[in-house]
């Protein structure tokens, strides 16, 4: 496939939707990322994380990286910040910026969606610098679901998809 504007639009849709799916999956399993005293380290907690990670095609990768020692914070860190994981929020936003940059260069125009995507990437870098233990995860995920939807709407406006 040619790497032209059609390719960029396909990839934009892929990564905006992928970020949304990851965010919503983590949000729906949020309570499982906060283990109770009777579940911590048990087979039940491991199976809960495994199911969530498998739904995002992330189980094998994280298990390999952590050598089988998976905890709630490593799951959240991996799915949100790890640039090596194609379904992580960080990876998706990086790809959105890359494809919007290609479109801006091709059409010789700046777009609001590119500014927002860059802002989201910068915010993720700042949040990554914080310890994952210090982030209010539920608020963080909720905010990014809203911002991701806003990004999709602005992309639609910028390129007259509405």
Model-identified regions with their sequence ranges:
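Alpha-helical transmembrane segments and their helix-helix packing motifs
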Residues: 1-162
